[in-house]
Amino acid sequence: MERKEIESLFTRAREIRALVIGDLMLDEYLWGKAERISPEAPVQVVDVTREDLRLGGAGNVVNNLVALGCQVAVCSVIGGDENGSHLRHAFTGKGVDLTGVFEDPLRLTSKKTRVIAANQQIVRIDRESRDEISLEFEEKVLDFIAAEAARFNVILVSDYLKGVLTPRVLEAVCAAGRRLGIPVVVDPKGSDYGKYRGATILTPNRKEAETASRMSIRTEEGLTRAAETLLAGLELDALLITRSEEGMSLFMQDGRTVHIPTVAREVYDVTGAGDTVLSVLSVGLACGLEFGEAARVANVAAGIAVGKLGTSTVSPGEIIAEIGHAHPDSDAKIKNLDALAAIVKAEKTRGKRLVFTNGCFDLLHVGHVKYLQKARTFGDLLVVGLNSDASVRRLKGAERPLIGEAERAHILAALDCVDFVVIFDEDTPLRLIETLQPQVLVKGGDYTPERVVGKEVVESYGGRVELVTFVDGKSTTNIIEKIRTGSIKE
């Protein structure tokens, strides 16, 4: 697909109403340094320096859909415990409809704790219930599906075998999809795929497909036989088998097969990559793409996802930058964080001074340009952290941004003073600053040093903060107001 088609896809994605049904869980990350061996046992001692709580399982699917710009609702059952409260809190500010999330006081909310040192996962600790939800809460889920399914454009089933997706629930979801003409896209688990009969498309990996088909998949012929068995037996429209370094293989009910090669890249972490495939594939189908086109976009997104550490999302801007060919010089400046970190590290060894600034840069104007030109004078490389569309909406309101993240990134990348652009989905650029460790952090003159996010981080290793005065009277807010009131002057 060409750049304009991809950009159009993610513009349409903002109108998509997606329902995620499945197992919600919390992902806890304990980041630290492992420099000692315990005197109690031959194990590493990790000195924890940072802790993160993130949405996991079906929650990571939600995160991906929000990052893609969709309107999202969730249907699940969680515990009425502290982790359940943490999980609900993790949805804050995402604009997600949680009316279909039910709390069972007798149930344990799933939580997975990962301990990471030197960018390597050392151990994972699980706290969860794998029992099926009770009949009472199964009825609540079934009632929600019956009452609400018709208002969605696509239904995503995220099965982690934690008990929410009972046979009755799955039967109801697939039946609703067929009845209403809504794609039902399933990330399956387990060995019995009969429970997914009637879904639109399944996205197992090779090992899962081998287990479900009970057939060896060591050759292309074996892969095809297994896929044909699953397609026919489950009455699917299509089957997308992910094959790690070999890409993906799409098998369709009409007999067509499409093999999609992967893009060679360094793999940091496969955690959550399946959630990214599920999300991007579903958005593509909901927007009217045929299976092959949607799978190709999902394959690109998966390649980006595995280059990140931990459960993470992929933004439209990252996908467009990876696919696009229309403006190769500008494209080369737009990087994901992991790729940029490697570049920055190499440039620093050559003695280059890194300058970092960030912002929404919606409706780029002369004030922005002069600000960025001044920022560039403080060092040798200027990296601009760009708020994603989802981040801008949280910060500025539902009517912003006026220009999508992909276009904003390309406009910034076209400026000679900008060396690299990296899109981030958080409300602040703290994670970018911690990772890139710029020597100079630049913010606008309307800030005081104490209010600058990342000041303590930068100063901790000898860097500094610079405040740049904005051009008087030049702001996106002022421009929007002038347009609304018709007071634009030459």
UniProtKB/Swiss-Prot annotation:
Keyword Nucleotide-binding listed? The answer is yes
Q: Where is this region: Ribokinase?
A: 1-330
Q: Which GO terms describe its cellular component?
A: cytosol
Record SUPFAM superfamilies: Nucleotidylyl transferase, Ribokinase-like
Q: Between which residues do disulfide bridges form?
A: none
In the Enzyme Commission scheme, what number(s) does this protein have? 2.7.1.167, 2.7.7.70
GO BP term, example: ADP-L-glycero-beta-D-manno-heptose biosynthetic process
Keywords in alphabetical order: ATP-binding, Carbohydrate metabolism, Kinase, Multifunctional enzyme, Nucleotide-binding, Nucleotidyltransferase, Transferase
- State the similarity comment: In the N-terminal section; belongs to the carbohydrate kinase PfkB family.
Please explain the role this protein plays, according to its UniProt record. Catalyzes the ADP transfer from ATP to D-glycero-beta-D-manno-heptose 1-phosphate, yielding ADP-D-glycero-beta-D-manno-heptose.
This protein's assembly is summarised as: Homodimer.
Protein name in UniProt: Bifunctional protein HldE
